[in-house]
Amino acid sequence: MVSVTEQNLDVTDGYDGPMLEVNNLKMHFPVTSGVIFQKKVADVKAVDGITFQIKKGETLGLVGESGCGKTTTGRCILQLYSPTSGQIKFNGRDLTDISKKDMRAMRREMQVIFQDPYGSLNPRMTCGDIVGEPLKVHKLTSGKGEY
């Protein structure tokens, strides 16, 4: 059971397995034909059977050529896309069968940096401000000195 409150943020609840498990993840997007009567003619297999684990304390860099499914994989893990099939577990909890409210709380514990980090940085902010902003938004820090 996952317990998330403002005072007590405990998403692991004693779990000591892999932090993130992705098993046979697939995300297929339909290709349609026709203007009025759209008919599915094919699927684009953006992600087709990816499997990996990340243990606590590890960092994973998903690297590949443009259009190979890196961003789609991250969006599926965060449940911004509903995968076609597969299983995603975060600290032992299946994310493919979780309420939107619980998923919002789980996202506080996840971080995905999408493709071009330099394009996503605000030149008017310091690195500390950029890193600290999500901590402040999710109320995980009380002030600037903590990050």
Placement of each model-derived feature along the sequence:
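ABC transporter nucleotide-binding domains
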Residues: 1-147
